[in-house]
């Protein structure tokens, strides 16, 4: 019966995956082929060039998406979860690499994650602009309004984020299915008129194009890469839908419809080279133009929503793994744990997208900024997957290299091709990536220095417990001390003794530990230890995708210790650390200032761990790093 249920839900899950996983790659036909014949390339629209570029597009889709991501990368899962942060956490756990060498792997993961943040800015801008630009095909009247309409759509999209997308999300899959079927039908209609375009499936057209235009190929590849945007999404969303529905949707709906549409656009160019102005919308019959513009706008909004949700999810993973400062995270759905809203990131993305639209003005101009982010992220994935295959699958090094080198070479060529556009827009993802990497690395290093200082300067907990005796006054109730260093006395406890001259009858030291897995089983959530008559140590283990609720976890811990649990009789003591600069080894002064600024603006511990505010006592302390 269970297998039957699974089979029954598989098509439904694949349909849901369409609206989340494939929105980005599904909107590429709006601009990708047009950019391949950009006037700056000086490439004539002759049949051999059209077939050559179409062949390159087809084989890039097959090699990068079908083989690399669908067949290989999606097997590198972290307890069912995918995405570059999950892969990094998995490699840090599995790979036998010296600690001083792990920094290089962390850096690669950080670069890939940072570029994905950049993708969250560029994708909504280029997608929505390219959809709205269809209005200029219908009439010139709309030309002055294209940018304002695009910005209005983007603003509306971000305004509704705080309300969640649980309700409208039900329609994303069906709408995206209609979109893909529309792509396929438009393509078939055009291919029937010019069937010679089907020669694109033969690799000899791609090889011939590369042979006759080696330098031009390099420039063209910078635009062809736009056809494989969103490959990372297949992997990143694997934990939400599972690999089988994603593969099913790709091979039976997405890939055929994309290929047919690119073939249809190519067939149109063979019939009418002037259609290069906008081959996607000129493929559409005049009577269907406005409905198609509406459909394209909905598809691009859905694609943008998927990327925004992906950025929120990635940020939460980075926060829980200790790579980003605590940010306020709101849950927008009672039934879907993954539906979250990060206010700070929401407004940051909105402002950045509007600035991007105002600077670049058209989707063609933005295409230069888009490609570099995509190719560098792919290259980071390839390197981390190679480490995974070597360490987790125990493949020999020659075998790993034989599998990975072809992808590495192809993606290195794509990186090189898109790097030529740094001055015309490629600087955008590089700038965003550099800022994000700096933040990630600075926060990670700052935390390491802070914890090292706490370990060094604070009393040993075991020594303190043995020596405390009756030298303090004991008061009724429970005191929970949140601490990141479980083997030393928390600053908050020392300050409580110093200022209040008391300790509670039960003093419970709680440390939250984030594991390198997405979820921790409930039975493995808690470890408890009785240190002495009045002292207990509790460790709460979470995965990097778990929702953290300390009061709920404490109930389980109290049961293990055989203690009576009453939240209204528990005081949570939290140390509010004030980080100050000190002379000596550590970070450069500007990084210390950045870390101190981030530390001061973190979300309160009580909010992050869902501790009732009226049960919290905050005590300040100063730490020099």
Curated annotation (Swiss-Prot):
Assigned GO CC terms: plasma membrane
Membrane topology: Multi-pass membrane protein
S-S bonds: none
Subcellular location: Cell inner membrane
Chief place where the protein resides: membrane
UniProt superkingdom: Bacteria
Record's catalysed reaction(s): K(+)(in) + H(+)(in) = K(+)(out) + H(+)(out)
Keywords of this entry: Cell inner membrane, Cell membrane, Ion transport, Membrane, Potassium, Potassium transport, Symport, Transmembrane, Transmembrane helix, Transport
Family classification: Belongs to the HAK/KUP transporter (TC 2.A.72) family.
PANTHER family: LOW AFFINITY POTASSIUM TRANSPORT SYSTEM PROTEIN KUP, OSMOTIC STRESS POTASSIUM TRANSPORTER
Function of the protein: Transport of potassium into the cell. Likely operates as a K(+):H(+) symporter.
Name of this protein: Probable potassium transport system protein Kup
Organism: Acinetobacter baumannii (strain AYE)
